[in-house]
């Protein structure tokens, strides 16, 4: 498969200042900082986007008091969180209590290192990209468990236990739903997976891997703890769950981390099933930059998360777990068997 260079050639006159390796490292660090900053900004903008979309969905105005047409509501919310008291309960395990939101934020941002936004824009071109994503997703479970246990609050602890069981369960289905794509492409590298789908929408993985896509969507919503699978923080049952004792910037890190994960899962759907930066048709659409198509597709899936929150009811915790093991697991296994059979037939 054709290799794509994501580090540009260094001009010869710059080699007199630093070595080529040093320039490459500086380029990657700068690119990573820009991408992570953009991701945080997009996640923050998604908050106000979600509030506007839910207001439209529910036939109301939404935020319209701060700035023209409510455009500065996000700034007001950020200032409010920043100036709130950063309180730590006396009975809490302070180290774990402080570590939990940092782990939640770090794992969400670090996972974006493997996302190829365009042929030349991406932090890391790793052959173990998908495995790295699952490693970060596994670490994110500890953030919720640390927050629930360190708070020494029964609602927090119940939320942490729910999160651990739900996330570990649905990460199994998340991984199995991707194995069909990996088997068809022959690579764990997201850039290779996107390149294999180039040439138009009829080459996208959504068609041969439709069952895998459905289970990935369900498992992605469950892993990000979004409605209707927001069991770890169910307000009516657990009073905000594992972050009930958090305030100020610690709560803000959990809050932003959740929306960063939504952007991450949306970007993964784009790369794995919808061709990444590939235009749907080559008839005039290719004049638009590849990053434009990536952002449009990602925004579509972010909107799907928002509309799911506004239209679906929250099931009971036992119903969520039963649905995973009794519906999602058989569907992913059937999809794997069909994919394996098709690969063997095509090889023969």
From Swiss-Prot:
NDH-1 is composed of 14 different subunits. Subunits NuoA, H, J, K, L, M, N constitute the membrane sector of the complex. NDH-1 shuttles electrons from NADH, via FMN and iron-sulfur (Fe-S) centers, to quinones in the respiratory chain. The immediate electron acceptor for the enzyme in this species is believed to be ubiquinone. Couples the redox reaction to proton translocation (for every two electrons transferred, four hydrogen ions are translocated across the cytoplasmic membrane), and thus conserves the redox energy in a proton gradient. This subunit may bind ubiquinone. Pfam families: NADHdh (PF00146). It is found in: Cell inner membrane. GO terms for cellular component: plasma membrane. One of its GO terms (molecular function) is quinone binding. It catalyses: a quinone + NADH + 5 H(+)(in) = a quinol + NAD(+) + 4 H(+)(out). It comes from Psychrobacter sp. (strain PRwf-1). It is a multi-pass membrane protein. PROSITE patterns: COMPLEX1_ND1_1 (PS00667), COMPLEX1_ND1_2 (PS00668). The keyword Transferase does not apply. Belongs to the complex I subunit 1 family. Its main location: membrane. PANTHER family: NADH DEHYDROGENASE SUBUNIT 1, NADH-UBIQUINONE OXIDOREDUCTASE CHAIN 1. One of its GO terms (biological process) is aerobic respiration. Keywords: Cell inner membrane, Cell membrane, Membrane, NAD, Quinone, Translocase, Transmembrane, Transmembrane helix, Ubiquinone. This is NADH-quinone oxidoreductase subunit H. Its EC number is 7.1.1.-. It comes from the Bacteria. The chain crosses the membrane at residues 25-45, 95-115, 128-148, 168-188, 204-224, 254-274, 287-307, 327-347.
């Amino acid at each position: 498969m054709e290799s794509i260079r994501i580090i540009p050639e260094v001009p010869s006159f710059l080699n007199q200042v630093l070595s080529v390796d040093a320039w490459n490292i500086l380029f990657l660090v700068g690119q990573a900082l820009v991408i992570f900053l953009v991701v945080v900004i997009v996640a923050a903008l998604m908050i106000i986007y979600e509030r506007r979309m839910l207001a439209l969905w529910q036939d109301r105005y939404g935020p319209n008091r701060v700035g023209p047409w409510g455009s500065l509501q996000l700034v007001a919310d950020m200032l409010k969180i920043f100036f709130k008291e950063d309180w730590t309960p006396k009975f809490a395990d302070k180290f774990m209590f402080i570590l939990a939101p940092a782990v939640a934020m770090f794992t969400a941002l670090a996972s974006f290192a493997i996302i190829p936004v365009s042929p030349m824009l991406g932090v890391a071109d790793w052959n173990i990209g998908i495995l790295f994503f699952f490693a970060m997703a596994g670490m994110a479970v500890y953030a919720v468990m640390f927050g629930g246990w360190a708070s020494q609050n029964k609602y927090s602890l119940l939320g942490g236990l729910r999160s651990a069981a739900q996330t570990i369960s649905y990460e199994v289905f998340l991984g199995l739903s991707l194995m069909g794509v990996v088997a068809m492409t022959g690579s764990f590298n997201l850039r290779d997976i996107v390149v294999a789908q180039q040439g138009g929408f009829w080459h996208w993985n959504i068609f041969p891997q439709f069952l895998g896509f459905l289970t990935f969507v369900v498992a992605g919503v469950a892993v990000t703890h979004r409605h209707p699978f927001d069991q770890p923080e169910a307000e009516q049952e657990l009073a905000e769950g594992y972050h009930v004792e958090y305030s100020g910037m610690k709560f803000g890190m959990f809050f932003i981390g959740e929306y960063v994960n939504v952007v991450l899962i949306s970007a993964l759907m784009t790369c794995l099933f919808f061709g990444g930066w590939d235009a749907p048709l080559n008839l005039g659409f290719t004049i638009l930059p590849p990053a434009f198509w990536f952002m449009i597709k990602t925004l579509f899936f972010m909107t799907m998360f928002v509309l799911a929150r506004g239209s679906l009811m929250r099931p009971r915790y036992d119903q969520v777990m039963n649905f995973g093991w009794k519906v999602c697991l058989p569907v992913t296994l059937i999809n794997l068997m069909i994919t394996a059979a098709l690969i063997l037939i095509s090889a023969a």
